[in-house]
Design a protein with these regions (language model features):
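Short amphipathic alpha-helical segments
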Residues: 3-7, 62-67, 106, 110, ...
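Amphipathic alpha-helical segments
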Residues: 1-18
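Short, internal acidic amphipathic alpha-helical interface segments
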Residues: 53-94
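A generic structural motif
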Residues: 56-60, 97-106
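Short, highly charged C-terminal tails/helix-capping segments
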Residues: 126-159
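A contiguous, mid-protein "functional segment" used to position or interact
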Residues: 101-138
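Short solvent-exposed loop/turn micro-motifs enriched in small/polar/acidic residues
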Residues: 12, 22, 34-36, 75-78
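Ser/Thr-rich, low-complexity intrinsically disordered terminal regions
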Residues: 20-40, 45-51
Length: 159
């Protein structure tokens, strides 16, 4: 059986992902998305488990209860990771995998899950937790003739 670091090294070498190895046990991987252009995910090899930690979005400005309800409902059907908040209220995807279970297929499934959950939840989380900021940004751009291209997904909040 390969050591977890060797498995992760082999996986990253065979996939077109941007990453850096912070130290011998920590890999910082940038996953490309669509709604959320990039998701930064850390894989951290511990004594007994591989920790997964990916930033999703900062602390919501409003409707925190609705945001948390959304996250808890999503958690019920997710594979190997779950939404969590840190001490600042920022939202992350977190998980643990026993070191004995670390193989390339599982790393692929976990990184795929991180990407899918972060990307598919990004716009709904923005709508729930930042709708006032989106409306202000829309008005500001319209008043200055700025592009609304990256706000088009939220047009229904304005009209």
């Amino acid at each position: 059986m390969l050591e977890p670091a060797a498995v992760i090294d082999d996986f990253l070498a065979s996939h077109d992902l941007n990453y850096e190895q912070k130290d011998e046990n920590t890999y910082l991987i940038t996953l490309p998305g669509e709604a959320k252009q990039q998701t930064h995910c850390a894989l951290i090899i511990g004594d007994h488990s591989l920790r997964i930690n990916a930033f999703v979005i900062r602390k919501p400005d409003e409707n925190k209860e609705k945001v948390y309800e959304y996250l808890l409902n999503k958690n019920a059907s997710m594979y190997s990771i779950a939404f969590a908040i840190n001490e600042l209220g920022d939202i992350y995807l977190v998980g643990r995998l026993p070191l004995k279970a670390v193989n390339e297929q599982e790393i692929d499934r976990i990184l795929g899950a991180v990407l899918q959950y972060a990307d598919s939840s990004f716009n709904p989380l923005l709508e729930l937790g930042f709708s006032s900021a989106i409306r202000r940004e829309w008005a500001w751009r319209v008043s200055r003739g700025e592009s609304l291209a990256n706000l088009k997904a939220f047009e229904h909040l304005i009209l």
